């Protein structure tokens, strides 16, 4: 047995020598960015690119750390200079499994009723040229106390919050802050850079309530079992939140990163076996993150030579695998050598270097190939099940979807169609994933929607979109061509719509402007027809729940295509409404739905009314350029209707070529759609018929126009009045050009 073990050890040694070849075994020590730089403050290590003191101790101002006294004055603590927040820890990216470095900082607690005056800290602002920081999605909003309503503010167009109370069923104690004495909500997944916390009582009054209540952001997990009284959080004064950080490659200083040279945008590359850098894209900016190769190196990749070779022989890893052979360290690895050349001669002299070695190598190669193939099959089955494949089959069968019209694509087909998901083929990016342009083997152009890393909570949302689209067949609705469930993240394949979205065409000036009044009126007729089909003509009635101009795509002939069913819901024929979490977009959200959480077909009608107003005025749903009381487009339009000056707000680009009677007729129809009470609004079938009549019979309009009661004036959800959201970083929906994206902006409110 002993000789057999030695035999296999010899074969392993020869194979290792063959693969590795002669390698240099010396290791290098990394030079510091500056030998005199202080790397410790308050017991916390400050690794480069962060630093304290002189400018050569840190990369740039965003990475500067100031070592100051704490508020008590008894000790020193590190502070990030640019954002003036106390540091708790800094972590470099350690492996390919993480996509960025991590910084933990202290965040103040928002409170009310705990002292004579409420405490509302300033929002955390990470914006600025070259800012490497963003708020990771591992953080949560947590609120503790009775009758609380906590909101995350400064998130552009989204609503996120939660409520807690001390009344009701105490069985909710078993949940993780499920609403009894404490609650929590996820922050948006699109990495916001400005974020704050607002706190009020459930009655809406931020100054009353009497009892102490607190709210804060944190990456720690809380449950009723470990949540203390709100006074304790108020006394502590702060919690810990997590920030991600990366290198901005637009900085000229980082054209050649300090640790890895010759950065390119082709994905992963290595400047040496010890250091690996990875390129990515965030909010339109390129960035990189580097880490020491996990196999045989550790250290700081942002210093020249900072990744140091690990001596596996000294640490025991190599010794345990070499057995009776000698472990020899080599850069990034180790190898096993014979103690003496003479020992090999008495042991199978003609076999050691002959055919057995060849057969052994071939056998190992065949075994590895078989195992890899088997693992690949198992992984595909696992991904299919985890991505909701069984649920999708059940839904298609239950709903009577046309299975033949939706193809199940293989991952190889989609990799070939998108050139292995090349970044140059990206059509748009959103909160839920990335859309690529692809070409199938039969020449068809498609849009491939690749979701982000799978969240088990979103499996049902993904399957819902597939189930809804598989049963829809309408010329003005984006067609689902198929899906792929055998990859780690689910993938949807749609028909490609070449001319982008309606929002971009309405609000971006261009020399080849084609959005005349006739085109706009035709588009409104097509959208209304598509929504009417969803509400009443589809095999199962469907509420879209996120009707807006960014979800209306235009084909090569500028025909409207309704897209994005990520928040849609199918209903039974005898149902009149759905009770759901509030989901939608500021400026388009039905006030009645917002107040009752009951979504009806009239809620889609309201959102379509906002789209009609956009088509008439050419203005955005929300704009800080308008007076404060009319920043919302609905309020602005309603005021003009009251004062009989609708023609003053008609888009100047279409005034000369439009029929004013048609514009007035559409404006009055929009006003009916924007009625405060849903029962006063027409249904989508009536809206579609009326728009068809306006378009085809412009000479006979006044006979069919009904005046609305003044008390039924439209209202809207106003970001400033209803939620106290400070617009510090406006979204493209309001002030800036939007990204070309078929993803829904889905603000969510968790109660």
Curated annotation (Swiss-Prot):
Instruction: Kindly list the positions at which Phosphotyrosine occurs in this protein.
Output: 494, 593
What is this protein called in UniProt? Wall-associated receptor kinase-like 22
Functional note:
Serine/threonine-protein kinase that may function as a signaling receptor of extracellular matrix component. Required during plant's response to pathogen infection.
Q: Where is the Protein kinase domain?
A: 421-694
Residues passing through the membrane, by range? 348-368
Keyword ATP-binding found: yes
State the encoding gene: WAKL22
Residue numbers on the Extracellular membrane side: 28-347
Give the EC number(s) under which this enzyme is classified.
Answer: 2.7.11.-
Keyword Transmembrane helix in the entry? The reply is yes
Region span, Atypical EGF-like: 275-336
Please indicate the ranges of residues that lie on the Cytoplasmic side. 369-751
BP term (GO), one: response to fungus
Protein keywords: ATP-binding, Disulfide bond, Glycoprotein, Kinase, Membrane, Nucleotide-binding, Phosphoprotein, Serine/threonine-protein kinase, Signal, Transferase, Transmembrane, Transmembrane helix
Q: Name one GO cellular component term.
A: membrane
Q: Which cysteines are joined by disulfide bonds?
A: 277-290, 313-327, 322-336
């Amino acid at each position: 047995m002993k000789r057999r073990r030695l035999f296999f050890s010899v074969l392993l040694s020869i194979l290792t020598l063959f693969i590795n070849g002669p390698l240099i075994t010396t290791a290098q020590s990394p030079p510091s960015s500056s030998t005199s730089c202080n790397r410790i403050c308050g017991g916390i290590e400050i690794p480069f690119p962060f630093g304290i003191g002189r400018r050569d101790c840190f990369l740039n101002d965003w990475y500067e750390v100031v070592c100051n006294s704490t508020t008590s004055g008894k000790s020193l603590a590190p502070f990030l200079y640019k954002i003036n927040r106390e540091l708790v820890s800094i972590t470099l990216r350690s492996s390919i499994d993480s996509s960025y470095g991590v910084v933990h900082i202290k965040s103040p607690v928002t409170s009310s009723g705990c002292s004579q005056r409420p405490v509302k800290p300033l929002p955390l602002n990470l914006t600025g040229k070259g800012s490497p920081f963003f708020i990771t999605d591992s953080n949560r909003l947590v609120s503790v106390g009775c009758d609380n309503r906590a909101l995350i503010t400064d998130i552009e167009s989204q609503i996120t919050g939660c409520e807690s109370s001390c009344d009701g069923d105490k069985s909710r104690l078993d949940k993780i802050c499920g609403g009894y004495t404490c609650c929590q909500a996820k922050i948006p997944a699109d990495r916001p850079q400005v974020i704050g916390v607002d706190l009020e009582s459930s009655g809406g009054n931020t100054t009353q309530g009497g009892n102490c209540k607190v709210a804060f952001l944190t990456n720690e997990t809380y449950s009723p079992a470990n949540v203390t009284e709100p006074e304790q959080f108020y006394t502590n004064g702060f919690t810990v939140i997590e920030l991600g950080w990366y290198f901005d490659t637009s900085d000229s200083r980082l054209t050649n990163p300090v640790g890895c040279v010759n950065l390119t945008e082709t994905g992963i590359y290595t400047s040496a076996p010890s250091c690996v850098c990875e390129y990515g894209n965030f909010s339109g900016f390129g960035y990189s993150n580097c880490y020491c190769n996990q196999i045989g190196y550790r250290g700081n990749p942002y210093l020249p030579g900072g990744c140091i070779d690990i001596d596996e022989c000294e640490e025991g890893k190599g010794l345990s695998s070499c057995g009776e052979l000698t472990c020899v360290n080599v850069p990034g690895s180790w190898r096993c050598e014979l103690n003496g050349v003479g020992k090999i001669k008495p042991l199978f002299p003609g076999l050691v270097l002959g055919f057995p070695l060849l057969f052994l190598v071939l056998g190992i190669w065949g075994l590895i190939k078989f195992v890899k193939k088997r693992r690949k099959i198992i992984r595909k089955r696992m991904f299919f099940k985890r991505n909701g494949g069984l649920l999708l089959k059940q839904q298609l069968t239950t709903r009577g979807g046309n299975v033949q019209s939706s193809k199940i694509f293989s991952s190889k087909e989609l990799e070939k169609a998108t050139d292995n998901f090349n970044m140059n083929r990206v059509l748009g990016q959103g909160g839920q994933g990335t859309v690529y342009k692809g070409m199938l083997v039969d020449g068809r152009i498609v849009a491939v929607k690749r979701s982000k890393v799978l969240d088990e909570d979103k499996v049902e949302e993904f399957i819902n979109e597939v189930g809804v689209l598989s049963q829809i067949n309408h010329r003005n609705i984006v067609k689902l061509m198929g899906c792929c469930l055998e990859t780690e993240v689910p993938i949807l394949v749609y028909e490609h719509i070449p001319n982008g979205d309606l929002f971009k065409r309405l609000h971006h000036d261009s020399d080849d402007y084609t959005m005349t009044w006739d085109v706009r009126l035709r588009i409104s007729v097509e959208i209304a027809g598509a929504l009417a089909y969803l509400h009443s003509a589809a095999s199962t009635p469907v509420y879209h729940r996120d009707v807006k101009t960014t979800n209306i795509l235009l084909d090569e002939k500028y025909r409207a295509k309704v897209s994005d069913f990520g928040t849609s819901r199918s209903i039974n024929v005898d149902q009149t409404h759905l009770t759901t979490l509030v989901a939608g977009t500021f400026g388009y959200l039905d006030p009645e739905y917002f107040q009752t959480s009951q979504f009806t077909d009239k809620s889609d009608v309201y959102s379509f009314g906002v789209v009609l107003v956009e088509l008439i005025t050419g203005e955005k749903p929300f704009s800080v350029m308008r007076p404060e009381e009319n920043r919302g487009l609905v309020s602005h339009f309603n005021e003009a209707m009251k004062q009989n000056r609708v023609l003053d707000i008609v888009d100047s680009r279409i005034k000369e070529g439009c029929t004013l009677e048609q514009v007035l007729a559409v404006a009055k129809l929009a006003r009916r759609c924007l009625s405060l009470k849903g029962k006063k609004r027409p249904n989508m079938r009536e809206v579609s018929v009326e728009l068809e009549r306006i378009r085809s019979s412009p000479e006979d309009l006044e006979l069919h126009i009904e005046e609305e009661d003044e008390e039924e004036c439209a209202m809207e959800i106003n970001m400033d009045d209803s939620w106290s959201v400070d617009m510090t970083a406006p979204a493209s929906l309001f002030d800036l050009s939007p990204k070309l994206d078929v993803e829904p902006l889905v603000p969510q409110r968790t109660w």
